[in-house]
Amino acid sequence: MYKRQIYPDHWGRKNEHQDKPSKAFHDRWLNRLKEVVDNYKPDYVWFDFGIRFIHEKYKKDFLSYYYNKETEWGNEVVVSYKWHDLPPGSGLLDLELGRESELTHYDWITDTTVHDGSAWAYMKNSKYKTTTDLVHYLIDNVSKNGYMLLNIGPKPDGTIPEEDKNLLEGIGNWLDVNGEAIFETETWDQYGEGPTKMNEAGPFSDNRAKLIYTAKDFRFTTKDNFLYATALGWPSKDFTIESIYKLFDNEIERVELLGSADKVEWKHTRDGLHITRPDNKPCEHSYSFKITRKESL
């Protein structure tokens, strides 16, 4: 919901005086949001720019109204915001076409698009990101305490373009094999290791630098007593994950490659976790090694 008093022509000229919204506007803003919540029961309310001009009382009233629906409906609800439009912790920080470069203590989300650029609607002859690009994006975000909100652009008749479908199916096929390393996981002590680093972070940083990951880039997630090390390329036959070095004897019980029934040979030393991978790939794009840790030392 854009604030028309700041952008009276929607995407046109800006009101440089930045008149503060009136009480009537505030009331209409809050009532419209409540109407959407009551009639459609959304799981997620996503705010673009502009709500920083909404009075604090009205923001609190909306957040209280919506978050209390979580108990009434019996399912989780989420609000995201940009910049400093809401206080930290009151919602999910949204980084449009960008992400964090390091592991964060707070949750955040990227809204990005399947188009290789910043198109948010259907475009003829558009260039697309690859499935590998999007899978890598998802893995990197999750390892840093982030999420990915992915946009596709339907045609005017409502149908989904084949290119968009293929990308979604490709991500789905990868998750069928490796979803265990993504869904309901938590971050580890560090997000990953490898030579590929982000030079810029934050909103719109994707437009300034495109990353090409290698087989030496790994991202980490955890769940229960499992540590997942996901390689962003097919590693060499014998490789070492230096971050997973030995602290105590018999820390690790088993190493598996998700999607593969082949045995994984491994050795744990002070230099890291040395792995001999199977010969055959279980999937494409990225490869998740499931490391079972002893529950008690």
Where are each of the predicted segments found?
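Mature catalytic domains of secreted/periplasmic carbohydrate-active enzymes
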Residues: K3-L297
